[in-house]
Amino acid sequence: MVYLDTNVLMALLCPEPETDWVLGWLARSDSLELVSSPWCRTELASALVIKERTKQLSKKEVAIASQKGLAILASTRCEPIETSDFDEAAALCSQGSSNLRAPDALHLSLAKRVGCTTIATMDVVMRKAAPKLGLKLINFRK
């Protein structure tokens, strides 16, 4: 199972430097079970409205991207966030050397709990932390 981070979803929906790599990975990965969480929906809404506020996307483009993003998330195995995920995320954030932000620690904690073996993320700090939790990384540049 592969946990889908919101930044990968954004690269599928909006022009990003990594969009071609992500599209290529997804095209080669149709048999993978993708996992997400309700938190991805929240981050998606936030990321899209930031694109609108910064004039990178129009209101109409945001609406279209939001619909597409929610459809992609609906096709994933959406796992609920549990109290234990927050506790584990807090423990990860408490490790000063990790530099993890709370939202990223929450993604990692949930992915680990539900048995994901791999993380699909482009976040540098998450990519550094994931292997320490026994999670493999998708290399989008292959």
Describe each PLM feature range.
Residues 8, 40, 85, 107, ...:
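Alpha-helix capping/helix-boundary segments
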Residues 1-40, 51-64, 132-133, 142:
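Short, well-structured N-terminal submotif of metal-dependent ribonuclease cores
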Residues 31-34, 75-77, 113-118:
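Short active-site oxyanion
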Residues 8-10, 48, 52-55, 73, ...:
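Short amphipathic alpha-helical interaction patches enriched in hydrophobic/aromatic residues
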Residues 70-97, 104:
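Acidic catalytic patch
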Residues 36-42, 103-106:
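Aromatic- and histidine-enriched alpha-helix N-cap/loop-to-helix transition segments
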Residues 1, 108-142:
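Acidic, PIN/NYN-like endoribonuclease modules and their adjacent C-terminal/linker elements
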